[in-house]
């Protein structure tokens, strides 16, 4: 299959959803030579992958992932990474705030690739066990409204792709597949992307993968987040319909900040930023978390406007519930460590 797929893509022909899924199955099963995988990834990058090619590849990644118990109405807050902005962990902090409102969040993430601190790094620095089994993570989702799914634990088949990606050294389709391959199969998703041209294609991919409500966002300062340093371009998926619009921090009563105000550091430094935000500190870092948490709450509860989501996120922090959520997660993690020990 992979030989035919390479030939098609080299000739600038598009693969169908089924063909893309099948060829990724071949790669994920270790049946393709590295040179074939490299050829396919290079050709896809040169051609630009289509919605069907991305969705088919994501479906294959999902099917090869470690199984996660079935969920209903679960939210994911995630970015593609690759913006090289070295911000603190905005999505992860926002996920904790959203979980504290009673909204279930299945956070799928990894260690840092293009930054100093990925979701796994900062959660580990906060004191959480990032290597929990699917059963334990599901239990956390039910008890604490938040589960972390460590990508490298769930996607063992990526071992067939990792060396090729490293040797190629440029962005490939896999740079956008991670956020689309959450084993919890979220129905609602706030997805940040590193390039504005990805907004509409990835919104359509999410739709194809069964996501019912989503916002795909790109900060025009380059962030793969909703940003307070510039406008944010948005494509929203709701009721099978896509809407494009732009938002500014000012329209939500937030100050426009400098991107330098949002820069983080090591996992330990970022963990301290997260703790301070959850504890109620005000400033630029809180504001961008409020914006992203507010957008995520709108995605999870479409009747709630982004502004109402921001207000709820602020109240959740100011009432101490967000910090309580972190403490619950830590207590749960410690309890499970004791059980294992």
From Swiss-Prot:
- Keywords, comma-separated and alphabetical: Amino-acid biosynthesis, Aromatic amino acid biosynthesis, Glycosyltransferase, Magnesium, Metal-binding, Transferase, Tryptophan biosynthesis
Task: Look up the record and name the pathway of this protein.
Answer: Amino-acid biosynthesis; L-tryptophan biosynthesis; L-tryptophan from chorismate: step 2/5
Where is anthranilate 1 bound in this sequence?
Answer: 79, 110
What InterPro entries is this protein classified in? Anthranilate_Pribosyl_Tfrase, Glycosyl_Trfase_fam3, Glycosyl_Trfase_fam3_N_dom, Glycosyl_Trfase_fam3_N_dom_sf, Nuc_phospho_transferase
Broadest EC class? transferase
- What reaction gets catalysed by this protein? N-(5-phospho-beta-D-ribosyl)anthranilate + diphosphate = 5-phospho-alpha-D-ribose 1-diphosphate + anthranilate
GO BP annotations listed: L-tryptophan biosynthetic process
Name the cofactor(s). Answer: Mg(2+)
Note on how the cofactor is bound: Binds 2 magnesium ions per monomer.
Q: Where is Mg(2+) 2 annotated to bind?
A: 224-225
Instruction: Tell whether Lipoprotein is among the UniProt keywords.
Output: no
Q: What residues does 5-phospho-alpha-D-ribose 1-diphosphate bind to?
A: 79, 82-83, 87, 89-92, 107-115, 119
EC number(s) stated in the UniProt entry for this protein: 2.4.2.18
Q: Where does anthranilate 2 bind?
A: 165
The Gene Ontology terms for molecular function here are:
anthranilate phosphoribosyltransferase activity; magnesium ion binding
Please give the GO cellular component terms listed in this UniProt entry.
Answer: cytosol
| Task performed by this protein | Catalyzes the transfer of the phosphoribosyl group of 5-phosphorylribose-1-pyrophosphate (PRPP) to anthranilate to yield N-(5'-phosphoribosyl)-anthranilate (PRA).
- Family to which this protein belongs: Belongs to the anthranilate phosphoribosyltransferase family.
State how it assembles. Homodimer.
Name the HAMAP family on file: TrpD
Q: What is this protein called?
A: Anthranilate phosphoribosyltransferase
Q: Supply the source organism's classification.
A: Bacteria, Bacillati, Bacillota, Bacilli, Lactobacillales
The gene name on file is trpD
